[in-house]
Amino acid sequence: PERLPHGNNGLGLKLLGLSGDEVLPADVYQKLKAEALTQVRGTVQADILKEDQAQNTCIFSTEFALKLMGDVQQYFIDQKVRNFYSVSISGYHIAEAGANPITQLAFTLANGFTYVEYYLSRGMNIDDFAPNLSFFFSNGMDPEYSVIGRVARRIWAKAMKHKYRGNDRSQKLKYHIQTSGRSLHAQEIDFNDIRTTLQALYAIYDNC
């Protein structure tokens, strides 16, 4: 085997393959890990129900995927991961598959409440997991898109407050919007920029 240059102990070659617990004292690593988990931000989009309904890229069964989603959420609870969304409940793909704005909203909220019921059935507390849920809607040219976010937030807040007895944070529906790819046309390509701009304006006026 080739010999390393003088003064090189090989550590630099190994760093990419090492985890923190291999280079730090155990107590230091655990402290840093716990702090990082409470601060890390991001989103998991693993919404199995929209896969079944719209995107059709399922690898595992719905039952197995639900269990996996529940395991992720339970890990977040156990490790006090509060700022990382365990699932992005997605209406965008449902809309791109052909749903109108009202149907998109209905399916997406129904999926969200399905996850709520499943997590509750596993013994999780509503206020421990509801803040880890986020939503993802499509926008289009239909006038209903100008209020889709406000309607979703109102329905979610009422359900969280009156049915599930969730606290103020659980009642907040967090979502983002992407403009619709389905609304763009090759036949009128010069107008696509205008369509996308109007859709973005809808989202802004809807307090996205």
Spell out what each predicted region is.
Residues L109-G112, R153-K158:
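Helical (often loop-to-helix) elements that flank the catalytic cores of nucleotide-handling enzymes
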Residues P1-N139, E144-Y145, K163, Q171-Q178, ...:
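Catalytic alpha/beta active-site cores
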Residues S146-A152:
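Extended amphipathic alpha-helical segments enriched in small hydrophobics
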Residues A157, S180-F191:
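Flexible, glycine/threonine-enriched loop-and-boundary segments that flank and lead into catalytic domains
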Residues P1, F191-C208:
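Conserved phosphate/anionic-ligand binding catalytic regions in large, soluble enzymes, centered on
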